[in-house]
Amino acid sequence: MAEPALLPAAQMERLAPGPLASPCPRIPRARIARRCAQRWADLGCSSGPSSGRMDQLPQKNLLRLHPAGSAGCSTGVESSSMDGFWMEVEQIQQRDELREEDSGGNEGQLPEEGEAESQWLQDTGLSGLLGGLGLDGDHQELLSTLTQTQVAAVCRRLDIYARSVRRQHKTPVRDVRDVFGVFNSGKMSSENGDSGMKGAQLSSGASKFPPAAEPGGLQEQAGREEAFNMDSAYSEQAAVLLQRSRPSRGGTSAWGKCSLPKFTVPKGRLGVTRIGDLSLQDMRKVPSLALIELTALCDILGLDLKRSKAGKWKAAETRLFGVPLDSLLEADHKVLPSTQVPLVLQALLSCLEKRGLDMEGILRVPGSQARVKGLEQKLERDFYAGLFSWDEVHHNDASDLLKRFIRKLPTPLLTAEYLPAFAVVPNIPNLKQRLQVLHLLILILPEPNRNALKALLEFLRKVVAREQHNKMTLRNVSTVMAPNLFLHQGRPPKLPKGKEKQLAEGAAEVVQIMVHYQDLLWTVASFLVAQVRKLNDSSSRRPQLCDAGLKTWLRRMHADRDKAGDGLEATPKVAKIQVVWPIKDPLKVPLTPSTKVAHVLRQFTEHLSPGSKGQEDSEDMDSLLLHHRSMESANILLYEVGGNINEHRLDPDAYLLDLYRANPHGEWVLKQNPT
């Protein structure tokens, strides 16, 4: 990622270190956990009744996290303790003036029956299917790209929505109590009624939380390299796995640095596509496709991922803290048009990288509450004016500012709609399937949230890389940062009694997986890129629907797709590469099965710098010119433009012949890297 672009400081303000604020009275961690048992139930997604004995939250003598050694696994005490999580919750409650009963409007509430399915169809671009309106061109194009499991997920949502509509319009049957009245017995209703209601609440609460993945199994996989297949849809892989064998009862815990296996994405003939390699027009199609695939995958895994409602937020009077990410970026674009991450977040991360990476306990040790509040006010007043100086900001204060910035966002960084989906990931028994669900969730996130999250995760990975100096293991970092990502605005979560430890560990595990596997998670799966190509190809052709039946139309589309591979045109022997700069003539490259994108880039570099020594009298001028051209050619990339893709930055290991067959009507263009 490019270095953060910070605002120039017009004047340097000296920040005199103030006296440390007197510590607040410590709150017993067991009491914090009980207070946290009021709001996290909304983060659990129902998939079945919980089973097995739940570990009780430690009431006394909680073990403190201690720095682990520079090598090897975390100790048993460290791997079983969540003390860092509850210490962070305690500090949040001490520093932020929380209102325990304030639920923030309707944020976190689950939609009513049928409403979730209606919203899902709108998010996936299939809202026209509601009410039997039929299929227009856009719906035809999208449905033609779906796999069988994805089509089944769409049909399932349509059926649920149709049933809810019929139920709403059905005339209710008259209750016999409306005719003859109700026998009133206060004593009976108070004794039996209350107990029955409590029993119903307990049973429904227990069914909301699926059995968590049990530890064990990963230690045997430690150090083993395993392939992470992105060529076929995850839901199709899960369906095949479900047919071949029974799902494993014991899960795989991701805790411990040594217990995380290494997953590698096999590079196919078309290469690997990262987030950012696709144009904005193509990338806008990915979230809806990823949402359909996520729903199909969760249907097969037996997870009910209900989308929560986004709460209403009041417009903040501040300019930095408590401001939506898109509003921050809108203001930042006036200063730096190319920025994709809020400048204040970049500045905070840059300050911590320069001053805090090697400091012991970074992110865990709190700063001065008085200084942090003063720094927040100075940032609000002086940041955009370029008058704020980071030179004397203590690294612990900067750490608190970073976490405070994340917590005070009007909506969670992981979004209010899909925060429950992130929280349910640890309940998936198989680690690879957890990664698949997380991968799709990352692709669904709005672009500002995804970019800000990536900047944060890159910084956290740098902290873990300096573990020998700062004594912060991957587990330490995850337990400290999890409350700031999952406790929106620092509010204690609601969850059933006895579930605190389970969900706290789950939240920290999600952060750990995102930090460790972020390169994999920020990849656009090959099957999604193929669906984008088909969607663009269908959009350009705009086939007319002759039969109104959905199944008939899908059958015809699949038949046409099978016939399309029989009439391939003759493959040219030479590929013409358009060059935007610095030459105008196209570059001719032999199109063979072994020609890679890297060969084109190497040939272009040799074309700019042929390596001739030249005459001695112009040696200095030629050497400077060749050096300049070599520097420029190092930033040259090959793009695929037109055809069934708008613009696609190609992987150097991709093969040209396979790219031509995937997009015969596209062009290849050499351009400078925009960054």
Swiss-Prot record:
Q: Which SMART domains match?
A: RhoGAP (SM00324)
Q: Do the record's keywords include Transmembrane?
A: no
Q: Where is the Rho-GAP domain?
A: 323-522
Residues covered by region (Disordered) = 95-118, 187-218
A GO cellular component annotation in the UniProt record = cytosol
Site (described: Arginine finger): 364
InterPro entries xref list: Rho_GTPase_activation_prot, RhoGAP_dom
Q: Which PROSITE patterns match?
A: RHOGAP
Where are stretches of biased composition, namely Acidic residues? 103-116
Per UniProt, the keywords (alphabetical) are: GTPase activation
* Gene Ontology molecular function: any one: GTPase activator activity
GO term, biological process aspect, one: signal transduction
One Pfam family name from the record?
RhoGAP
The protein's matches in PANTHER family, at most eight in alphabetical order, are given as: RHO GTPASE ACTIVATING PROTEIN 18,19-RELATED (PTHR14963), RHO GTPASE-ACTIVATING PROTEIN 40 (PTHR14963:SF4)
Q: Could you tell me what this protein does?
A: GTPase activator for the Rho-type GTPases by converting them to an inactive GDP-bound state.
- The entry's protein name is Rho GTPase-activating protein 40
Native organism: Homo sapiens (Human)
